Amino acid sequence: MANKNEPKITVAAENRKARFNYAIEDTIEAGIALTGTEVKSVRGGKSTIAESYADSRDGEIWLINANIPEYLQANRFNHEPKRPRKLLLHRKQINKLMGAVEREGMTLIPLKLYFNERGRAKLLLAVAKGKKLHDKRESEKKRDWGREKGRLLRARG
């Protein structure tokens, strides 16, 4: 049963392949600057962040290649689906993320796009390092073994 004190968030888009393709070091919550039609489209649940990433430009962090489709009920004031979107972070957070990307060869990957309890659009951003093919195989073996172990324990018990 859900706890009443738990924050109520509505997940709009999730990057499910990110945990398989990347080794996640750290996560950070960032606000995202959206236009009105983008917010309505995201609430509709059609947006995807699977192929997107974050990059630094002119001392700011931008979300690149996130697909938020056009809002059908909007007319000529609609938005461009794959435009770069500014992420709202504190200066210390931006400097930390830019340092990790430049010095350590990390990548900024969005994990989840959601609305918090106040109705604000937020993006869970991960500082991650790309996995090699053998690392992916190893994590797949661990996952399969966990499933098999669960099956064996259920059959036995």
From Swiss-Prot:
SUPFAM superfamilies found in the cross-reference section: Small protein B (SmpB)
Region (Disordered): 133-157
Superkingdom assignment: Bacteria
GO MF term list: RNA binding
Bias (Basic and acidic residues) ranges: 135-151
Keyword Secreted belongs to the record: no
Subcellular location: Cytoplasm
InterPro entries named in the record: SmpB, SsrA-bd_prot, SsrA-bd_prot_CS
RNA-binding in keyword set: yes
Pfam family, any one: SmpB
Keywords carried by this UniProt record: Cytoplasm, RNA-binding
Gene Ontology terms: biological process: trans-translation
Gene Ontology CC terms, in alphabetical order: cytosol
Protein's job: Required for rescue of stalled ribosomes mediated by trans-translation. Binds to transfer-messenger RNA (tmRNA), required for stable association of tmRNA with ribosomes. tmRNA and SmpB together mimic tRNA shape, replacing the anticodon stem-loop with SmpB. tmRNA is encoded by the ssrA gene; the 2 termini fold to resemble tRNA(Ala) and it encodes a 'tag peptide', a short internal open reading frame. During trans-translation Ala-aminoacylated tmRNA acts like a tRNA, entering the A-site of stalled ribosomes, displacing the stalled mRNA.
Family affiliation: Belongs to the SmpB family.
HAMAP family, sorted: SmpB
Protein name: SsrA-binding protein
Organism from which the protein derives: Bradyrhizobium sp. (strain ORS 278)
Source organism phylogeny: Bacteria, Pseudomonadati, Pseudomonadota, Alphaproteobacteria, Hyphomicrobiales
